[in-house]
A protein has these predicted regions:
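Structured surface interface patches that mediate subunit assembly and partner/cofactor docking
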Residues: 25-29, 35, 39, 43-46, ...
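A short, structured loop/turn motif at beta-sheet edges
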Residues: 13-14, 59-65, 89-98
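Extended, alpha-helix-rich binding/interface surfaces that flank or overlap catalytic cores
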Residues: 185
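Glycine-rich portal/gate segments that line the openings of hydrophobic small-molecule binding cavities
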Residues: 35-75
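Hydrophobic/aromatic beta-strand elements that line small-molecule binding cavities or substrate pockets
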Residues: 7, 55-60, 84-91
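Beta-strand/loop substructures that line and gate deep hydrophobic ligand-binding cavities in soluble
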Residues: 75-127, 136-138
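Terminal, regulation- and interaction-focused segments at domain boundaries
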Residues: 1-14
């Protein structure tokens, strides 16, 4: 049973095509993370909401006109990757472009559940096309079910949104991390993600020249590295250890570290750049629990974290998390 929906964007077909195919633009309305090999036979993997990733291959591509891809969900016995087909057709009309999406190969029950999703995300696409920004996706705020990998994906969505506010004007601003400017903190975050990724077998990112690095937005650099690392960690699983540090590091601890890197540094960067941080209490409470499993006297002693700051247990979970990591004035 097919699902069929058409929306209008006040954009030309080429701009609309970029919104539905390029990872940087997909992250603004549809995905938390996206891997795209845009060629016929090329694969894609889109983390739609934390803990739930769609995957498949591209079967038709006409830039500015049409894209067809197989569709399914990782880990789903009922609709695995490749089990259905999504066709998106773009037509130039007065004032913009119509975007028609047809999802074939679904049962009636699957069509009903996907209709809810497509209405949600195509609505976000329209808002993005009209207003230029659609805001954070409430569906990505708290994973269901929640686990250390899904919470890391939710925290990644938060830091990516903050990173879009990093500009040349605020790149040199100081951050709550001592001795780190915004630019230096972004580099630190990238290095932390890459070190865990390398331990998982992800190729180490090439070291670009300063000029080349400056030309790539901070959000793109972090998002690309994080997508590869999180996909590799999800594929590997959280049992056992990874080759990181003397004697190895428990894979579960690596996941915990990513949670802290994403969410705590999102607060650091938001504070430094004057942005408002939006975090669901259930997410910050869960990550606080991971922090209590991960941050020890030894990690505080080696300089990774400052001593915890006293804060009332009645305080909200995000200030308690920040205080536990040693952040001053976490409120």
């Amino acid at each position: 049973m097919p699902f069929d929906m058409t929306v209008f964007l006040p954009l030309d077909p080429d701009a609309a095509f970029r919104l539905i195919t390029e990872p940087e633009r997909l992250r603004r309305w549809k995905t938390v993370a996206a891997r795209v090999e845009l060629r016929v036979g090329g694969e894609y993997r889109w983390t739609i909401v934390p803990g739930h990733s769609a995957a498949g291959t591209f079967t038709e591509i006409e830039p500015g006109k049409r894209v067809v891809l197989t569709w399914g969900w990782e880990g789903s016995p009922d609709l695995p990757p490749g089990a259905s087909t999504v066709s998106i057709t773009l037509d130039a009309v007065d004032g913009g472009t119509t975007v028609r999406l047809v999802h074939d190969g679904l049962t009636a029950e699957q069509a009903a559940s996907h209709a809810q999703g497509w209405h949600h995300f195509l609505g976000r696409l329209v808002t993005l096309g009209v207003e230029g920004d659609v805001g954070p996706d409430e569906w990505a705020a708290v994973p269901d079910p929640i686990d250390p990998l899904a919470s890391a994906e939710a925290a990644l969505a938060i830091v990516q949104r903050v990173l879009r506010g990093v500009t040349a004007a605020n790149a040199g601003a100081p951050t709550p991390c001592e001795d780190f400017t915004v630019t230096e903190l972004v580099a630190h975050l990238l290095d932390s993600i890459a070190r865990i990724g390398t331990a998982l077998g992800v190729p180490e990112p090439a070291a670009p020249s300063s000029a080349a690095a400056a030309s790539v937005p901070a959000e793109v650099r972090i998002a690309d590295a994080a997508q590869k690392t999180l996909e590799a960690l999800r594929l590997r699983g959280l049992a056992g250890t990874v080759d990181l540090g003397p004697g190895g590091l428990p894979a579960s601890t690596a996941a915990n570290i990513l949670n802290l890197e994403f969410l705590v540094h999102a607060w650091d960067l938001a504070t430094a750049t004057g942005q408002q941080l939006e975090v669901a209490p259930a997410l910050s409470d869960y990550i606080l629990g991971l922090a209590r499993q991960t941050i020890t006297d030894a990690t505080r002693g080696n300089g990774s974290f400052h001593p915890a700051i006293d804060v009332a247990e009645s305080a909200a979970s995000l200030p308690r998390l920040l205080a536990f990591t040693g952040r001053r004035n976490p409120s």
